[in-house]
Amino acid sequence: MSNHWLLPENIADVLPSEARKIEELRRRMLDLFRTYGYELVMPPMLEYLESLLTGTGHDLDLRTLKLVDQLSGRTMGLRADITPQVARIDAHLLNRPGVTRLCYAGNVLHARPAGFHATREPIQIGAEIYGHAGLEADVEIQELMLAALTAAGLSDIRIDLCHAGILEALLAGLPSIRKIEDALFAALETKDVPALRELTAGMPQTERDALLALPTLYGGVEVIERARATLPASPAIGRALDELAALAVQVRGASVNIDLSDLRGYHYHSGVMFAAYVAGLPNYVARGGRYDKVGEAFGRARPATGFSLDLREVAALSPVEVRALAIFAPWDADPALRAAIAGLRAGGEIVIQSLPGHTHELDEFNCDRQLVRKDAGWVVVPR
């Protein structure tokens, strides 16, 4: 007999206690974004593939679930990342001059899980600034990311900083690098120095030495000065290190690390990149950076920076307790009781009315009060 209740691998239901926490954090974060002036957008779950993947890297293509549209015959994709969709909205639909701040929250689907235990259906929430090329926008986004994690109750946060411009400058004079690009990125991300030695054999010595040095350029902000002494003294690398130094001093409420080989998302980032970690966990809980080139694919190149996180992951780490206080009410046909319940609910109270025969069943709400008949009416008293 088949098990009709089975779900695909790395797909799971969200049960009430987890769903309450996820929804609480979603509301907290969206309300937080609104206090900074971010406007909510809701891109579609499904788009034509060429639109969904425009301006993105090969990694997003591999993570995108694809199907054929029965109306048009064209290939469509279920979004694996909302960020490119928001870039499309800014570039093509809003078409505003000046600065635009947008935020979003929604499910995404991954054809492959990011890790062994990772969900293939994250709930992505994030914020983006378009139209300002200065580091001030990156500072605001980084501040907002930390505020969102703090709103979720997380503490002891570390920010790792990197810059896509450093690797871009090192590879600019090496057109043949495209053949080994993916392997090179993988070796840098995992700090696999033996693999790097093999991959860089035959490269010009200056670039090779710099690439081999990147995995060692990890640690506190003093790494920036070590990088200045170790890497080629090109204007592009100098600017990138200056930006990292300026961003590092702006971090409040978190420790700062520099990791010049943390290049996840390099294909679509164009400047500073940052990731947030919490103590005791090897994987980041939020990630962001600058991606000025994404809007160009939609016909409007705009400076852009943003961050995102998975609400399901953050909810699993969050100490926030979301067990709502409620009022217990008996089942009674008395119109006065119905009026009392309606008035309490209109005022924002949770009122749970027991059904006949189920008065003593427990639920996940904390009914600390109850409605009782008193004189000719109904009143709320402690339970």
From Swiss-Prot:
<dbReference type="GO" id="GO:0000105">
    <property type="term" value="P:L-histidine biosynthetic process"/>
</dbReference>
<keyword id="KW-0963">Cytoplasm</keyword>
<dbReference type="GO" id="GO:0006427">
    <property type="term" value="P:histidyl-tRNA aminoacylation"/>
</dbReference>
<comment type="subunit">
    <text>Heteromultimer composed of HisG and HisZ subunits.</text>
</comment>
<dbReference type="InterPro" id="IPR045864">
    <property type="entry name" value="aa-tRNA-synth_II/BPL/LPL"/>
</dbReference>
<comment type="pathway">
    <text>Amino-acid biosynthesis; L-histidine biosynthesis; L-histidine from 5-phospho-alpha-D-ribose 1-diphosphate: step 1/9.</text>
</comment>
<dbReference type="InterPro" id="IPR004517">
    <property type="entry name" value="HisZ"/>
</dbReference>
<keyword id="KW-0368">Histidine biosynthesis</keyword>
<dbReference type="GO" id="GO:0005737">
    <property type="term" value="C:cytoplasm"/>
</dbReference>
<comment type="similarity">
    <text>Belongs to the class-II aminoacyl-tRNA synthetase family. HisZ subfamily.</text>
</comment>
<protein>
    <recommendedName>
        <fullName>ATP phosphoribosyltransferase regulatory subunit</fullName>
    </recommendedName>
</protein>
<keyword id="KW-0028">Amino-acid biosynthesis</keyword>
<comment type="function">
    <text>Required for the first step of histidine biosynthesis. May allow the feedback regulation of ATP phosphoribosyltransferase activity by histidine.</text>
</comment>
<dbReference type="InterPro" id="IPR004516">
    <property type="entry name" value="HisRS/HisZ"/>
</dbReference>
<dbReference type="GO" id="GO:0004821">
    <property type="term" value="F:histidine-tRNA ligase activity"/>
</dbReference>
<dbReference type="InterPro" id="IPR041715">
    <property type="entry name" value="HisRS-like_core"/>
</dbReference>
<dbReference type="Pfam" id="PF13393">
    <property type="entry name" value="tRNA-synt_His"/>
</dbReference>
